[in-house]
Amino acid sequence: MSTRRLAALAVAAALLAAAQAQANEVVHVPSRDGTVLNAVLIRPEGAGPHPAVILLHGCGGRDARSGALDPRHADWAERLAGAGFVVLLPESFASRGQGPQCTVRDRRILPWRERRADALGARDWLAAQPFVRAEAIALMGWSHGGSTVLAAADAPGFAAFVAFYPGCSRALRAAAFAPAAPLLLLIGEADDWTGPEPCRALAERAGLAVTYVGYPGAYHGFDAPGSQVRLRTGLAFTVRGDGTAHVGTDPAARADALARVPSWLAERVRR
């Protein structure tokens, strides 16, 4: 390859890196409990105003060990921004000096307490931005973040809710569960970490307010990009109570979710 060609490729790579750096902006978002949250903001093309979606990480936190967004979060954020959504990813654990919580039984950061406050604070912050349609903000989360979606589902000001494989038992035990906006629940029918049964029962009780999608044979984390199914150990809470659960990609379930969720959200935030 010629020197000129190599130089051109180097310039192109530098421009791409600069564009990506501009696309992923670090912002500071006040939680309703007063905590200042580190958050990543990704804006679609155009001045807007655009619909927006808040993405809530699971018990492992928002970022990979490298410091970049976890591959699942990065994948979804890129796809949703490409579909015209402003995307905000607050980090609930590191912002409070805490690490991953998957193996922690005595958790200091809970879906119905700190993380609900974070979700509402993120909504407040987005609603104040001139490039966001304040009436078109959705909330979406995975596992611990999905449980947070359920905990915040009674709050006004959201256009839609999406929860991937949440823990549904607490919501099911509540005297009433009435989402303030449509809720989409997606879970693997073989999930042995949070378990599908409470979520299925919750959806049946809630009626038309909740859409339940169960994927036969899929485990926890089925929508992750290229994650081989494996058995995790040492987890704090699992279906069997022995600290073990399977996680990993299910290609068919992932493909369905990647097509279903953006379309479903677009329908709920349409003008």
Please report, for each region that a protein language model flagged, where it lies by residue.
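N-terminal cap/lid segment of alpha/beta-hydrolase-fold proteins
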Residues: 22-48
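Short substrate-entry loop that stabilizes the transition state in hydrolases
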Residues: 48-50, 58-98, 170-171, 192-195
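Cap/lid segment of the alpha/beta-hydrolase catalytic domain
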Residues: 61-72, 89-114, 229-243
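Alpha/beta-hydrolase active-site loop
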Residues: 108-129
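Alpha/beta-hydrolase fold nucleophile elbow
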Residues: 131-141
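Short beta-strand/loop motif that positions the catalytic acidic residue
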Residues: 179, 185-187
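Acidic catalytic loop of the alpha/beta-hydrolase fold
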Residues: 190-194, 220-221
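Short alpha-helix in the alpha/beta-hydrolase fold that links the catalytic acid
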Residues: 194-204
